[in-house]
Amino acid sequence: MSFLVAIVGRANVGKSTLFNVLTNSHDALVFDFEGVTRDRQYGQAKYDDLDYLVVDTGGISDKDVGFDEFMAKQSQIAIDEANLVFFVVDGRSGLTTGDEYVASLLRQKDKKVVVVVNKVDGTDEEAAMAEFYSFGFDKVFAISAAHRRNTQKLVDKFLKKPLNEYYQDYTQTQEHKEQQRHGIHFSLIGRPNVGKSTLTNRMLGEDRVVVFDMPGTTIDSVSIPFERHGQKYTIVDTAGVRKRGKVKQTLEKFSVIKTLQAIQDSNVVVAVVDARQGISDQDLSLIHFAIKNGRALVLAVNKWDGMTEEDRIQVKQDLKRKLFFLQDYVDIHFISALHGTNVGHVFESIDTAYACANKKITTADATCLMQLAVEAHSLPMVGKFRIKLKYAHVGGHNPPVIVIHGNQVSRLPNSYKRYLENFFREALDFRGTPIVFEFKQSENPFADRKNKRSKDEGSKSKKVK
């Protein structure tokens, strides 16, 4: 599960602008994939190679009634789940009753809160911050999100330490969980009403999850441990993720965050697609997110029963066209969650993907495969010199990380990197898991001697003169 930063405050104080600064700095919004409109409500950001999630909770007001009141209450869910809260206020307009209301809500929570005084461009920062100390929060900081003034300092000062502490604790906790779990943790993801909860019940063999024929029945991730044929599993039925324009309720927006966190916390992700609706950009976004996070993947095309042969051919052609990047290694199953058709095969692919994602490979085997790949397809020339790959070893699991050391590796063409991935995948029979390749430049063991010799020769020449 990722570190979560919640941006809260009344309306029109610049929360969305700060959100864009935090997420756009590394162009890493959750749904910022080709052909998909960037979502401005929740996103993924990076600080010093550490990923974290950001949620803009929308304006909070003490005058909210009806549906707006419901949304304001659900915004508090995001605050409850957050590891750090940026409470944004407007430095130009000064302290308002709306700000005081938000502050009163935050004082009831045991949360790390930073009062972010925005829009201070052209004003005295100290004067702008002064009145906001009355909230009782000891951390107050002035920025101009629109002009990115002090925004990096904000992150360096208030995010760096808790983020590093969180991941240290989280790594230890995850290692403990893995020791205790000894099973496969997989999540079902997809749009609303594609049959995730029905598939969950079918896999469990009982009605553990409430199912209705309407979108959005599941609003939070439901985690259920179980055992099948002696193998332990934990299944996570996630909330459906809809198209950006249709995600309006704050509760639903936060359920998207929970879904993304479930993906990151899984060993294997099962992407469920409705055969009758086809695969959408939103399906592709979720699949891309899973792959980007190194998750093993299985695709289940549901509601296959009752379709004509002509429609089935059309669906398969559509899948082949849109999922061309998965054809080589991801298993695709055409199922009926309602009737149980082919659900057993989904389990088989989950087991296979998990095993491949955690496959043990010795340094000798990795190096041997690398050498065989080079023998089969020579390395390209870089100027007068040929790139040289020396040895390879495994740098991690789930996903498998192959680290290759050599000379001039930074100039290795992407086409050759793809060739290496395909070669390793075929040789090791990797199914269902992405493979990450890291290329490291080998250090010259004689570099220091050479530099020292040059210095000595320089000193001697000076003496001669």
Curated annotation (Swiss-Prot):
UniProt cross-references to InterPro entries, sorted A to Z: G_ENGA, GTP-bd, GTPase_Der, KH_dom-like, KH_dom-like_a/b, P-loop_NTPase, Small_GTP-bd
PROSITE patterns, per the entry: G_ENGA
Binding residue positions for GTP 1: 9-16, 56-60, 118-121
Binding of GTP 2, residues: 190-197, 237-241, 302-305
Molecular function as annotated in GO: GTP binding; ribosome binding
GO biological process annotation, one example: ribosome biogenesis
EngA-type G domain sequence ranges: 3-166, 184-358
Domain of life: Bacteria
Keywords from the named record: GTP-binding, Nucleotide-binding, Repeat, Ribosome biogenesis
CDD domains xref list: EngA1 (cd01894), EngA2 (cd01895)
Every KH-like domain range: 359-443
Similarity remark: Belongs to the TRAFAC class TrmE-Era-EngA-EngB-Septin-like GTPase superfamily. EngA (Der) GTPase family.
Known partners and oligomeric status: Associates with the 50S ribosomal subunit.
Protein function: GTPase that plays an essential role in the late steps of ribosome biogenesis.
Listed name of the protein: GTPase Der
